[in-house]
Amino acid sequence: VELSSASFGQSNSLTPIQLCTGLCAIANGGTLLKPYVVDHIIDSNGNTVKKTTPTEVRRVISEDTSEKVRTMMKGVVDNGTGKNGYVAGYRVGGKTGTSTKLAESQGDKTKYIVSFAAIAPSDDPEVAMLIIVDEPNQDLGGGALCAPVAAQVVEVCMQELNIEPVYDEEETNNLPIDTPMLIGKTVVDAKQTAQASNL
């Protein structure tokens, strides 16, 4: 039974950092990197005294497999359980998750962790994240509880990294537009103002 349930993750115990490390391997074209928390240390004068450099551990999947998984993850956000992870102008890949908590004594109540793992942009990832809700009060999954948080984080990260949004036609048509104030203007003035605003 354990071997069969392992295929959908119900017998394996992972830490969040292990899950993120695997997610990053998918984002990195299949190369597993040693995880680290501190990027660099600066002294009181603002000089960098220590810089962490990424360390490759090994290749765990092929680049082709990595690309296919990223495409499937994008499909989870575009058409699947991760729709709430969508961010207009950015291609987000994601995977919703529900985990059963392992404990020696839980009584009769099974406890869960819900999650959403995301990468962005999915075609050339710069950011990977894992949003977790431990023992949610509501009977909702990672797509409902965690994906909206991931969308907010992705949007901020993309802005901080100066990654410009690239809107498809549908997204462009749904963008809000600023309309000039036309109240109290004559028809001629209103028309000129509207034309000046490309309306």
Q: Model-derived features: where do they sit?
A:
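Active-site beta-strand/loop architecture of penicillin-binding DD-peptidases
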Residues: 1-56, 73-162
